[in-house]
Each structure stands twice: as C-alpha cells, then as structure tokens.
C-alpha cells in the first residue's frame, strides 16, 4: 500500500513489516520467482509474430506493468524461448515508475519513441493496452488473455468451481493449453475445440 509501480524488492520490504526475518523474506521472494518461471508459458502465436517482426527489421518494444526488474524479465523470456531484445527495448513499469493502466508510460513512449512514426501495440488489457495508448495516437490490437477467453467460452462455468490454490493452478494449466492461441475461439463462436489428443488429455 502506498508504493506505486513497486519492484518485487520494494513489495517484500513492506511484507517484512509483518516481522518476518530477512531469511524468510528472501526465501519467499525466491520461491515466488521460481514458481513464476516454472509456470510461465509463451503464447506461441504472439511469440512467433514478435520473432517475425524482429526478422523483418521492425523495432519492437516489450512494455509491461510488472514488479519484476529487467534481469528477471529477461530470465522469463529466455525460459519461454523468446528472443531477448536490447535492454532499451524492454519497458517495465517498476523501473520506469510509470505504467500502462494510468497511461503515464504511453505519454513517455509517445514522446521518446512514437513521435512522427506509426506504432501498433498488442495487449490484453482494454484500459492499459487499448484505451490509454489511443490517447497518445498509438494504434492497438486487443487480444484476450487466456482467463478472459475462458470466461467468454463454453467452459466459463469451470471458473465457479475454483475454491483452492490447487484448483486455480490446475485451471491455469488447462487454459494455458486450450487458449494458448488468442485466436482459438475465433471460428467456433466460443465453443472450445480440441485439435489434438495431447490437449484433450
């Protein structure tokens, strides 16, 4: 509370006020990072589009509202098999101290990068990734997150049966497979279909 665009270290500094030891804090913070790295999965259609744009010589920026710092983000990208761009092409809210949801990061982007050029942003948050960029003349393309795809699919009822952390993890693993592609529901009117036996299993 009271910490805007905080880094993970700043967040855990606040948690330390609950009288946890430095060792406890370090262990819990590392556990959070390890779990995120283990569970993080690239959305292949979007990752492939990103790689294609790089191959075509396009300037691509990765912009995220996130409490992980640059090295952690690069570790996540590497784990997911995504080409890591130069540091200046990764904008993270906790390091920039401005963000997508408030729109402040788009103001800076439009002044430093997007001036007098055509830009397209792709994201899954209607406010931070669509409405706010538009205020600064930045075009956007909205894709649904896997969670939003679930809630707009024929399997939406599953969400009401999530009662525990284990349930949440299991559902996350399911939707990461079913809705890895943000276009998975485009031709089915929201009905979930299985293209191969691995996904069905």
Q: What are the language-model segments listed below?
A:
Residues 1, 149-165:
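Conserved phosphoryl-transfer catalytic core
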Residues 191-201:
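Non-catalytic interaction/regulatory modules that flank or connect domains
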Residues 132, 163-182, 188:
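Extended catalytic-interface subdomain
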Residues 5-61:
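Short, acidic loop-to-helix structural element flanking the phosphoryl-transfer center
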Residues 122, 127-155:
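Acidic, Mg2+-coordinating phosphoryl-transfer loop and its flanking beta/alpha structural elements
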Residues 1, 16-33, 83-91, 116-118:
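Short, surface-exposed acidic
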Residues 61-118:
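Substrate-recognition "cap/lid" segment bordering the active-site pocket of phosphatases
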Residues 42, 68-71, 97-100, 127-130, ...:
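Flexible loop/turn segments at secondary-structure boundaries
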